Amino acid sequence: MCKYFIKIVSKSAKK
């Protein structure tokens, strides 16, 4: 669960 969240956040943070 957290893994997915982190993955999405990482993408957003890269923006």
UniProtKB/Swiss-Prot annotation:
Its main location: secreted. The modification Lysine amide is found at K15. It is found in: Secreted. Keywords: Amidation, G-protein coupled receptor impairing toxin, Secreted, Toxin. Expressed by the venom gland. One of its GO terms (cellular component) is extracellular region. Disulfide bonds: none annotated. GO terms for molecular function: toxin activity. It comes from the Eukaryota. The keyword Secreted applies. Anti-inflammatory peptide. By activating the G-protein coupled receptor formyl peptide receptor 2 (FPR2), this peptide markedly activates neutrophils, resulting in cytosolic calcium increase, superoxide anion production, and chemotactic cellular migration. In vivo, when tested on a auto-antibody-injected model, its administration strongly blocks the clinical phenotype of rheumatoid arthritis (RA). Mechanistically, this peptide inhibits inflammatory cytokine synthesis from the joints and neutrophil recruitment into the joint area. This is Scolopendrasin-9. It comes from Scolopendra mutilans.
